[in-house]
Amino acid sequence: MALSAEDRALVRALWKKLGSNVGVYTTEALERTFLAFPATKTYFSHLDLSPGSSQVRAHGQKVADALSLAVERLDDLPHALSALSHLHACQLRVDPASFQLLGHCLLVTLARHYPGDFSPALQASLDKFLSHVISALASEYR
């Protein structure tokens, strides 16, 4: 399902509100993913995965940067995320289901920090946005 103008506006407005804290929330979502879905740790065996570790924060910032790029380039997600898709599919060989798990944990994290803003409309728009991001990231797997 395509992102409507309202979806785009809601996602962009939330991203603007998150500001410089995007990396904090993506790091928390990554930590939440590791706790809730321990199999996702498989791809990070070379990192210190303890909560708050500098390595998890660094990867959380990479996730934040990728999502911020996606928000900026909503009209061309497959092209904007093609290098990341190739990296995850061909070099890192990450199971694309892990992207869905991280997306779910990001929704939970954002809802926890912004309960007053997290309306059903915003949740639906973010879910659609993350679905499009996940689809773009999984494109090299086909």
Swiss-Prot record:
Gene Ontology terms: biological process: hydrogen peroxide catabolic process
CDD domains in alphabetical order: Hb-alpha-like
Keywords, in A-Z order: Heme, Iron, Metal-binding, Oxygen transport, Transport
GO molecular function: haptoglobin binding; heme binding; iron ion binding; organic acid binding; oxygen binding; oxygen carrier activity; peroxidase activity
Residues that hold heme b according to the record: 59, 88
Domain Globin residues, every copy: 2-142
Disulfide bridge positions per record: none
Domain of life of the source: Eukaryota
InterPro entries registered for this protein in UniProt: Globin (IPR000971), Globin-like_sf (IPR009050), Globin/Proto (IPR012292), Hemoglobin_a-typ (IPR002338), Hemoglobin_oxygen_transport (IPR050056), Hemoglobin_pi (IPR002339)
A single GO cellular-component term on record: haptoglobin-hemoglobin complex
Record keyword Signal present: no
Keyword Cell membrane: no
Membership in a protein family: Belongs to the globin family.
Protein name: Hemoglobin subunit theta-1
Organism: Pongo pygmaeus
Gene of this entry: HBQ1
